[in-house]
Amino acid sequence: MLDEFLGGLDGTPSCIMGNNKLISKLRACARRASMYQVTKDNWGNQVENYGSIPFVDMKTKPGTNDEVVGIDDDAGTTSLYVARLAMDGLHAVSFAGVAPVQIWLPDFSTAGAVKKGEVEMNAAIALKASKAAGVFRNIKVK
């Protein structure tokens, strides 16, 4: 079913994203299908792949232990997300005439050990081709 889902996209996705439980099950399936590969990125980090597509564990929300991609407790299902990151697929955008990252530094000429500054990021995403991203819902993991 995963190959059928990936085949419905307009190209090879840049990543397969989900929660830890789903990624673990996909990893096991990929091993059985001889599609599991482990490579190292430019920084020496181990990257697990389904063929040439890296698995991405979305982990938990900052400051909590809640999964970014949750599991429905009643049905025991979750969702799988894929995206082809490219200028003609899914990519980041910033507002016209505004720098994506704005920085306000504190006044270092005043006395005091504690200074206050700000950093603001203005960004959004654009999906240029509807088949460049997809979600596979209701995958049983429990």
Task: Show which residues each predicted segment covers.
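Sequence/fold signature of self-assembling virion shell proteins
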Residues: 3, 11, 24-142
